[in-house]
């Protein structure tokens, strides 16, 4: 459930420690947008990258207690924090639940952010994690911006444009832009968590974000 960013034009490689277990992850790419803009840039590095910082430098330097290095400069347009650990994210959601009202559409919805700006982690893609309390029955709304979800914890279902999609941990589903949707947690005793990545940085940057709440049927869709 860790979230790792590999921003545009950054060298990156994936691997598993010797003797480690097989690793499967979900990739989120902005290639369709970048290709449409004819701005794609792709290159292959011969060999492996040379390590220039200590292990876990980024999450240790930029992901601790709201503190950032006072003697470092960062001039990149993306977050200097490359790894957002689930072991920190889930407790943060639980703490946020103690002091925030439950949103009727999204429960507790927290955006992954650039610690230097408070904005999105990258210029073309955003990400968020939301907690649906036990027994949560979300109301329906729709908005511009496309969202791809992965269930990080629990089980439930989402109704998208009148069709029900059940999900459990590791399942992936998407909500297209301007589609009615509502999330439901099937457990009456355990919370559920949904991760998403989205194109909100682009939508918001172009001034195209808008949303609407469903008012019929007490805010819930009729399942087709």
Tell where the protein language model's regions lie, with residue ranges:
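Conserved metal-binding segment of the jelly-roll/cupin
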Residues: 1-18, 25, 160, 167-187, ...
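Short amphipathic alpha-helical linker/capping segments at the junctions of internal repeats
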Residues: 1-3, 33, 45-50, 164-173, ...
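Contiguous mid-protein beta-loop-alpha structural module that forms a pocket-lining wall or clamp
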Residues: 4, 8-62
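A short hydrophobic beta-strand segment most commonly corresponding to one strand
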Residues: 4-5, 19-39, 149, 189-210, ...
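Short histidine-centered beta-strand/loop micro-motifs
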Residues: 15-16, 121-122, 137-143, 184-186
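A short, N-terminal "cap"/entry segment at the start of jelly-roll beta-barrel domains
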Residues: 44, 48-124, 128, 210, ...
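Active-site lining segments that contact anionic ligands and/or coordinate catalytic metals
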Residues: 107, 124-127, 145-146, 155, ...
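Short, conserved beta-strand element in jelly-roll/cupin
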Residues: 124, 129-134, 141-160, 197-198
């Amino acid at each position: 459930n860790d979230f790792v960013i590999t921003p545009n034009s950054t060298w990156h490689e994936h691997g598993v420690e010797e003797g480690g277990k097989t690793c499967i992850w979900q990739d989120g790419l902005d290639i369709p947008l970048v290709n449409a803009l004819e701005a794609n840039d792709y290159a292959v590095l011969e060999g492996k990258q040379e390590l220039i910082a200590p292990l876990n430098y980024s999450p240790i330097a930029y992901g601790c207690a709201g503190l950032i290095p006072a003697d470092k400069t960062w001039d990149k347009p993306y977050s200097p924090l490359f790894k957002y650990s689930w072991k920190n994210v889930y407790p943060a959601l639980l703490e946020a639940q103690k002091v925030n009202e439950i949103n009727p559409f999204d429960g507790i919805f927290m955006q992954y952010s650039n610690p230097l700006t408070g904005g999105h982690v990258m210029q073309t893609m955003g990400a968020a994690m939301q907690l649906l309390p036990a027994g949560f029955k979300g109301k329906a709304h729709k908005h511009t911006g496309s969202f791809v979800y992965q269930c990080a914890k629990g089980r439930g279902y989402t109704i998208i444009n009148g069709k029900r999609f059940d999900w459990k941990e590791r399942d992936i589903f998407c909500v297209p832009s301007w589609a009615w949707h509502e999330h439901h947690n099937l457990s009456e005793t355990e919370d559920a968590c949904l991760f998403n990545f989205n194109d909100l940085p682009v939508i918001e940057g172009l001034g195209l974000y808008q949303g609407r709440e469903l008012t019929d049927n007490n805010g819930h869709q009729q399942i087709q």
